Amino acid sequence: MNKDIFLTNNLNNKKEKFVPINKENIGMYVCGPTVYDNPHIGNARPLVIFDILFKVLKSKYGHDKINYIRNITDVDDKIIKSAKEKNLSISELTNNVIKDFNDDCNYLNLDNPSQQPKATDHIDLMIKMISTLIEKDFAYVVNDHVYFEVSKFDDYGKLSNKKLEDLIAGSRVEVSDNKKKSEDFVLWKPSKDDEPSWDSPWGKGRPGWHLECSAMSKKYLGNVFDIHGGGIDLIFPHHENEIAQSRCANDSKVFANYWIHNAFITMSNEKMAKSTGNILKIKDFKDNVDGQVLKLALMSAHYKQPLDWNEKLLEDCKNTIDKWYEVYLPPKDKIVLDEDILSPLYDDLNTPGYIAKLHQLYDKALKGGNEEKSLFVLACNFIGILNKTKEEWIEFKKKKSSINEDDILEMISLRNKAREDKNYKEADIIRNKLLDKGVLIEDKDGKTIWKLK
């Protein structure tokens, strides 16, 4: 496609035309989960947003031209703490959470990334990078710890657009007598006897969190690549530290050219976070909410804006998809999406704009023929919506309904009998009972038809 892609780049907080380093091999790195607990809806937002970006890049440059890396952090203080609390080994915990995470991604109908590397498979690369930073005098060793010396990197704070002293004052900085200055951050630290550890030139220990992404992005994408993404909470200190250690280790003036960050999901205008217990886990929705409903809800606000999560949002999205399935028709192979349809997504991933476009296409499909219906469904499929057949959608609604089909038909029969007897009060009571159980009825051409809400 000839249309340009525009993205808001947090390096300068401006919307810029996306120009890849090499359009034959575009690199995108997104910070994935730290697998100490199951993902919640707040974690799902970047998964969905960067899946959309992955799809957009593939649509423009080709499916085999995008190298999308989404890492898994499987060594971390939170993991150690969680494993002890749950009386599990580290490997048992991380393997369980990784499996659940992958199941959640399938539930949301996300495209698989090109690679999903685990931190523990790349410890040797991290040790090598630390050694390089020490040799170049950007890092120092104290009591089996290795720290990055922030004052030696002049561009520190550029991504956050803040001075160093402001960043330190406004964040929780690890306090340690080993550091030269409070802003220095750990690259390697010793492990206790019951904690995961690896041999290194500085003794048995494990890497700092920030180093993991620098080592893995270097392996899979090189010293400089196109896009780095994650939640807005990662800008500082995680992404700021990544930039510092990567540029210093690699002697590069750039780490990633475009930095994309999504805003938080809130509940009652408070950030959703595991640390506060203010969370809704993805797995808790699976029995009662179809994944595409959840996905549409996550796309209902622009990724740069906070999204307040509530039951009405979910209900509205379910009703929208229910309506859209009324015109469902498997898309024809020859039909393609033109640039005009995809234009909102090319403009800084404007998902609300794309959803508005889908409503327009639905109206045309409702009045048009098979070609209009196929085009509408294809446009929905592009973002992973209407990916199930109409029969599968109805079957899911039946499973979660508190009433079976035989009971529905029996109640409709009783209602029809009440209407024949002119007992309209009783007929209304039965209608309302069905409605309470999620069943809508309509009298049409002398018959009563029903559908699940």
Swiss-Prot record:
Domain of life: Bacteria
Positions bound to Zn(2+): C31, C213, H238, E242
Top EC category: ligase
Protein residues bound to ATP: K274
InterPro entries: Cys-tRNA-ligase (IPR015803), Cys-tRNA/MSH_ligase (IPR024909), Rossmann-like_a/b/a_fold (IPR014729), tRNA-synt_1_cat_dom (IPR032678), tRNAsynth_Ia_anticodon-bd (IPR009080)
Residues spanned by motif 'KMSKS' region: 271-275
Quaternary context: Monomer.
Keyword Nucleotide-binding among record annotations: yes
GO CC term, one of those recorded: cytosol
Recorded catalytic activity of this chain's protein: tRNA(Cys) + L-cysteine + ATP = L-cysteinyl-tRNA(Cys) + AMP + diphosphate
Protein's GO biological process: cysteinyl-tRNA aminoacylation
Similarity-based family: Belongs to the class-I aminoacyl-tRNA synthetase family.
Name of the encoding gene: cysS
Name of the protein described by the UniProt record: Cysteine--tRNA ligase
Subcellular location per the Swiss-Prot or TrEMBL entry: Cytoplasm
Pfam families, per database record: tRNA-synt_1e
Binding note for cofactor: Binds 1 zinc ion per subunit.
Motif ('HIGH' region): 33-43
